[in-house]
């Protein structure tokens, strides 16, 4: 979405992964690198973030597993560098519970810079409205991504299909960006200095 808005975007991936970065690279139009406090260390992580900040207007760091899973976790990385967290929650089978889950993510660790949430796999515009309205007043809504075959990436036994195997990947990414643009109701978090 933000690339379509004309922003230069750099993306990093927490932990070891080779499938997600290929898809993220297509979405961002820039190389995607691993960012991990354990594997690369604090100094290397700081260096690559500093370099990316010099060439991009937005840096996105995709976590691995759940926000608090692993040691160090994506939450540890966010806290260490003061990076605002956007919680992406699979909302396909919930309504008001979405607000409770978002509240739990935001308040589980008091010092986590939590920016807000985005709902994934929503059933309709009305479903997105219900999810947004379930949020406590202090949590920001970043939009909803609908459940749609035009957006979802196919999977197989061991995970996602590789980027080069998807002839329509760019169309899927464009559809996802359009869906987020249609439901987003807030600006980006404040820049990290």
Predicted regions and their residues:
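Short hydrophobic alpha-helical runs that function as membrane-insertion/retention elements
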Residues: 85-88, 142-144
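ATP-dependent carboxylate-amine ligase catalytic core
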Residues: 1-81, 89-112, 125-129
């Amino acid at each position: 979405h933000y690339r379509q808005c004309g922003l230069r975007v750099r993306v990093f991936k927490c932990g070891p992964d080779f499938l997600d970065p290929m898809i993220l690279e297509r979405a961002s139009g820039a190389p995607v690198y691993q960012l991990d406090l354990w594997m690369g260390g604090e100094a290397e992580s700081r260096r690559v973030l500093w370099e990316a900040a010099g060439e991009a207007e937005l840096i996105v760091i995709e976590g691995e597993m759940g926000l608090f899973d692993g040691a160090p976790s994506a939450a540890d990385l966010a806290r260490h560098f003061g990076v605002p967290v956007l919680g992406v929650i699979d909302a396909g089978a919930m309504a008001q519970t979405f607000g409770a889950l978002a509240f739990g993510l935001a308040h589980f660790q008091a010092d986590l810079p939590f920016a807000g949430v985005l709902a994934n796999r929503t059933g309709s515009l009305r479903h997105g409205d219900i999810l947004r309205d379930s949020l406590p007043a202090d949590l920001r809504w970043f939009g909803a991504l609908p459940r749609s075959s035009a957006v979802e990436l196919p999977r197989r036994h061991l995970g996602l299909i590789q980027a080069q195997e998807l002839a329509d990947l760019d169309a899927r990414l464009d559809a996802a960006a359009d869906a987020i643009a249609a439901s987003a109701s807030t600006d980006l978090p404040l820049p990290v200095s």
